[in-house]
Amino acid sequence: MANREGGRRNSGKLRRAKRKVCAFCMDKSEFIDYKDINKLRKYVTERGKILPRRISGNCAKHQRELTRAIKRARNIALLPFTTE
């Protein structure tokens, strides 16, 4: 018969990943500056995509601010839209 667990071997021993803490909340930074390219590059992939919240670990408020800052930096050519 088919395995009802969906192929999982340790079905009863699921382990939750540790929740990442928002780096901007830890620093207690007032706002995210779009001119701080080194900080913004940590949250952009090699392909130029913005990392989602579940990967970056940011809170919702700072993820919105980060997205705005990255888009502003792209518009004034501080960050590239895509890689070459």
From Swiss-Prot:
GO terms for biological process: translation. One of its GO terms (cellular component) is cytosolic small ribosomal subunit. This is Small ribosomal subunit protein bS18. Belongs to the bacterial ribosomal protein bS18 family. The keyword RNA-binding applies. GO terms for molecular function: small ribosomal subunit rRNA binding; structural constituent of ribosome. It comes from the Bacteria. Binds as a heterodimer with protein bS6 to the central domain of the 16S rRNA, where it helps stabilize the platform of the 30S subunit. Keywords: Ribonucleoprotein, Ribosomal protein, RNA-binding, rRNA-binding. InterPro entries: Ribosomal_bS18, Ribosomal_bS18_CS, Ribosomal_bS18_sf. The gene is rpsR. Part of the 30S ribosomal subunit. Forms a tight heterodimer with protein bS6. It comes from Clostridium kluyveri (strain ATCC 8527 / DSM 555 / NBRC 12016 / NCIMB 10680 / K1).
